[in-house]
Amino acid sequence: MGKKKIINKNNPEALKEAGNKAFASLNFKEAINNYTLAIEIQPNHIYYSNRANAHLELN
């Protein structure tokens, strides 16, 4: 059985990394969710850019 990594939801960089992994796995909705949570904690142009890319891939 695979282990699921616990994400620190108060760490925007950890959320970005989780979003990147979801994006790489083609799970764009999960990626968008993680990037959005990161933005809510610490607005950052990279998080916005990553989220925009995930939206483009989703559509």
Label each residue range with its predicted role.
Residues 1-59:
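Alpha-helical tetratricopeptide repeat
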